[in-house]
């Protein structure tokens, strides 16, 4: 029976669709003119078409015609006689497809196929189908009729379809116009009328073996290069290259449309989890994660995921029905209780007879039935195939995936058991079967082969017969597999059986035809066909000979494997559609097309049963998978493959069955890899108007959404894959999340998922593969603590399990473990193991738990075993408890103490029990003490082992103590070490030996350094710290080590620590190009430069070719040429934040043109404000544009904020400002809160849209909350602030004292309401806030608990109250009764006592050693980062009272003791009187000169006495060199007037040393300035900004009439540096200085100044005239620095500022108002200052008083505040 053309046409349409992969959505109805009659004509024509007509090629007839027209010798000739009649049109399918390719009518054709599938799925009625597709069908009929029927429809009036033609074209029936249009635009054109001139029967068709070359030469000449002429293949190649150009574009465009439509459709089906208003998100599944990735442009590796595997798809659900539509059981799931012998016998005859009748109770594909029953309806005189032969060759059905295979097996087993035994049971490899077929064959063969009477116990018998094998193997498969597959067994198997026996043991040998493994998914078992058809049919002669007579197409299919033509049988069909592709030979299309293509077509038109409606993505998924299988790997290029894979992935997501059928288990690792790469990347997207961001802000939002919604999915993937790399990336992403978002993420996850992720982190940490930088360890602890919250109970075992992560936990989280934790020996062992990584505060918290009486009792009763078990915690016991350890207890741990890390007090207690000075083995004792020797006094060291050898072991050990900070370089032991070094001389030490002395480098005198060689000095540089080199040493060393010629970048960078030694001479020796290159290595040292050194560095870049860069409005003709244009300066990036505004103004345009480069620089407040104005930022700038500005956005004006209309946008901008690394300036902060209150008081606030944004506000904003709003904050918001303070305490210290106290009280109220006892846990939570509690709150805290939580700054009020509490009897008692133990217990808290109380402490309790330790501890605190930020009170008087018993005589009638250098180091230089300094030995003074010069507490007489000693050392002052002047420092104040005049002050280096000294008398100021002008020969008008900066404090030595001659241009630049000084100028001098700013070259009229100008000029603003100050606006006032506020003379301050102006001060400005200024203010003015200090909240003493002076204008109604507080309650 000939194949009908109708199913074949459908197949071709399907292939056509899949080749282009465009959407199946119908494009809408077309014209109905052709009518439905065309459909009938089409069907009748197809049925009546003679089969022989298909062997003719109308297209090659056309080629013959057009080629003959170009044939040589016939070009231009007319026809000879009458032309022969045209042959009847013949249609070849590839001709038809070539015509349609690129046509806009592809869309209607694809719509036709989509509707056809919908019709079969009963989603459309036949009427709807015909209505929608009548136009398409009509156009198709026109083409077919024109090709098949002579004299068909006339030529259409509409233009034919081309790849670039109009959209209203029709399907062309004439090949020539179509081809000419397809070739349009090339370099040739047809010049003659084309007529047929030869008999077309002579033209060879596509299948012909011999072509007529003379027919093709003309066309080949047009399409191919000359060298390629002569073959039909060259013709096709040229044609495809010409017309195939748009194919890939159309292919990709279609896929793109499919992907876009699928995204929305799949999204509507699956949905997408999103964070709610609280930041929580219900976790999505893996399909939703993949969809999220597609929507956010993640590049999933679809090949690795399994969606481009190239395997044939499973039969679509649409095609599973048979003719009657009765639901049938799956053949792969037989009833377990029916044995093979009990199954009903199935005859082949009955199978064929019932094919059209009732459905049989088994599933056999129609194609299988058709193939088997061919003998019943023979179409050719070929002999009938033998059913026996069919069953003998049924192997390929057994290994095929087709459902009919099982029916075949059952039928052959029942009818031909012998053949079945031979063909299947005896010769088939057991492992080659699919899973379901393997089970069936196992049962069928077991029924045919009776088990042998006895299976051999040892090796299998020889020969091994199939009967014995199957019987024994099926009886005990595992046992026989072991016996059969042994090496000895395999050798015993006969050669005839070795192949299949080995196959059973090892599985099939891998080759191109090997079947891929079966995959069990949610849809059951899938066993893709991997080439078995080719093996079992083409390679099997019997089956091939039986089947080929009935199916001739198999001959073409099997050509490759049978050694024939290597052309795929479908290549002729698809070749025109697939240009530039590799040969189709290896593709699955050539290997196994039959089982699924013909099987599908045999079922497609017969499906009439009720098929459930299928979603469009499901239908499309099947077609896309079929396309992937047909095209083979790599079709369309990488880009097209990626798009195809994305479409496949999307279409599979809604259907669990399709998704898990394709998804590979190993795809999980690919998902993790893609997510990890996405989390690591920073997306860059430029934005319009030049505001280009370097990082896309939406990327951060998307990553946050990904982590919030899909973390449980990622955790599950991690648990399965154990990807340490992905775990590292994911943990890093969590560590960078805002704490509140991370908390919501963890709390919204399932408990088991969170616990599983914590286990993963623990495993990564144990394996050492989870690495976290120190800066993120705190964040890791926060993440660990959040995950711990998902455990219902924290047990000791959990502590042990998580011990590797314990060092990262906060103390408050650590305290959540039960108090009985330390009673567990395993817990103590874990603490010992991980104590090196634990922080001191963690150990302190655990050590305090040791003191619970119910655990171990009192400290003196602790046994040795317990002491050893808790040894890591002992150094962190409170000192008063540690002192309870007895000598016996201490000596029991003698060998363990050196490595315990004891502090000074603890160490001294241990040393008292371990050191025996009466024995002779002093050196051995010191050796055993190890690091504890650092706490020995000089006297103890001298008695045990005198220091004498600079390279000795004891000396090296002490130097190690100095290196790690245990030993102070300024202490007495260090002085003894320095004596050893000086006595031996540094020149005798090698560079390596000298390097160990680097910790004491700052104490080495200049003369000692001068004696060292250059190699020795260079050897020490790498080990020096920046602060260990004094400025005088830096000047000396830089002058010696800096090459004067050919200085390289590497050489300069190696000297970066010496940059503070910059002098005019060294700066001149450094080429500017080297300075520019060294910017990155010098940047860390720039903050250590003096103001004058910074100015000189900037001046270096202002001078080009000897010409200084001046402004156009310079100060005068001496320095500026009228009309001169400023010369652009190229500034190194590291210097830009140091530029004065005047210099920044010159180059602002060049900077802003390249602002993307500078968006991360730490611009100052005034620089950011200035550049913001210069940018002229439009009001409609988006948040993304603002983020692109980086730190420049910190200069945002209040007006810009006020013009933001949307509340949501306003909050987003505020959030962005608080995320900047630079601190929010005071005026902008005040503007934010004022604007926020105004918006919240509006009649209709945008409450409906504000909610989600409020939850994202940063806790930094809450920390900055005005005091007046703090009382109404929610408890959750307060806790967010407390957590921020614990993480970043420096942010707390940036607040005013009033703000700190208000926040501390509010936090305590939240944690422990009134009448509630305050526990240690509460104070642990408060952390740094404890030291700012008020008096009443402090007295409510148990004192012992309070004293153990005072490791941070102490507010003035708190410190005063604490000092009173320390003197209570229950604590330390009266000071006059103190002993050394009480002093050691008090530690640095002794300075909280009053001066009177300190003076009462007995002398015996304050020995030299105790004093030295106490003062060292206080000095170490003051020099620490936190101590410098704390801004503690001046302690000079208290320190003097503390050391009075040592430095003062015991009785008034006794002379003062003469101190030596050791005494000075044991106390402090200011403790010595002028008499004592004068009487010191010269050598002692020389050794302590650096200490005297650096002590700012010296009175006016002491410097004079010290300078008397210095002159004895160095001679008269006129001989002092720059290094000596720098070393003397403040001692120069002690010079007499004549001596001061003799100092050499020629260059700015020496001048700046004197300019930095505060405390000169007015006479001395005048002498210094006069001497400099006289010696340098300069006039005041010629002073540039470097020398003006160098003058510093001495600028006030110029008279008013001299000040007016200063260049306003130069002074405006120096204002940045001079404005930071509290100049001792008179009011008249300050007014003259301030007047310079309004002159030409300055900043212009004061009324035009912005706040940035007031910030720039600093304290010089105090000289602005009264009237000008009185006229300042709110914004201008807020630019005045707090220091400038404090230096305004009190009478002037009271006159110029009104109460309204004073109330507009920022809180930091109001706090700077001095008591002297307050004394001059009126009551209304004082209330205004108090209002500003409390940020709008009345101070306690002002509550209830009237505010009639006008503050109502600056406040808000009470109901407005209620709204504001309500808004702030939503901040969580």
From Swiss-Prot:
Subcellular location: Secreted
Glycan attachment residues as annotated in the record: 65, 427, 476, 565
Assigned keywords, A-Z: Glycoprotein, Secreted, Signal
Signal peptide: 1-25
Cellular component aspect of the GO annotation: cell surface; extracellular region; kinocilium; stereocilium tip
Biological process terms in GO annotation: cell-matrix adhesion
Pfam families assigned to the protein according to its UniProt record, in alphabetical order: Stereocilin
Family membership: Belongs to the stereocilin family.
Protein name per UniProt: Putative stereocilin-like protein
